[in-house]
């Protein structure tokens, strides 16, 4: 028994023992290293959603502020325009016709405008082949109303509706206020002349005196 044990110990080399010790220590270090390393947590998907929601809220707030500012500016401009229109204008000023461009034309003046029946043979300087308001062509024997001064022609219904809220020609923007005032003045003077009764005329005839002469009485 003693001989066999001594032989087995003598046969083992010291290099093999050293390698076994290194291998066991390396395996222990590797085991400890794997236990120490913990898996890194994956990024949460809620972080991206929160960023997206914040951007959407910011954009919506900016749009809302812009809308409120535009509405406020629009209301301020309207108030300023209304206040400027309410300012009384001088009757003899140069801007008097311009301020009254949107007051419309009276019906009496509209009735005094010339109305013709359209035909292709009409050679009027301001008459076109279509109405500038409804953009439809004139038909033969159709009633067309001509505006004074510019002589532009339109359908009777179209121009009456237009001039109920405007005082200018829809084609050339010529102001009709002064023309309508002249027409109204002429109509008033003519009506006064027609209603005024004729005055009785008294004719005095003065005969010349006869020359004086002596009258002799004969018996």
Swiss-Prot record:
Subcellular location: Membrane
Example of a GO biological process term: protein ubiquitination
Lineage top rank: taxon: Eukaryota
EC number: 2.3.2.27
CDD domains, sorted: RING-H2_EL5-like
GO cellular component: membrane
SUPFAM superfamilies, per the entry: RING/U-box
Keyword Transcription among UniProt keywords: no
Residue ranges crossing the lipid bilayer per the database entry: 57-77
Catalytic activity: S-ubiquitinyl-[E2 ubiquitin-conjugating enzyme]-L-cysteine + [acceptor protein]-L-lysine = [E2 ubiquitin-conjugating enzyme]-L-cysteine + N(6)-ubiquitinyl-[acceptor protein]-L-lysine
Zinc finger (RING-type): 131-173
UniProt membrane topology term: Single-pass membrane protein
One MF term in the entry's GO annotations: transferase activity
Keyword Ribosomal protein applies: no
Pathway, per record: Protein modification; protein ubiquitination
The entry's keywords: Membrane, Metal-binding, Transferase, Transmembrane, Transmembrane helix, Ubl conjugation pathway, Zinc, Zinc-finger
Family under the similarity heading: Belongs to the RING-type zinc finger family. ATL subfamily.
Domain remark from Swiss-Prot or TrEMBL: The RING-type zinc finger domain mediates binding to an E2 ubiquitin-conjugating enzyme.
PANTHER family assigned to the protein according to its UniProt record, in alphabetical order: RING-H2 FINGER PROTEIN ATL78
Protein name: RING-H2 finger protein ATL78
Source organism of this protein record: Arabidopsis thaliana (Mouse-ear cress)
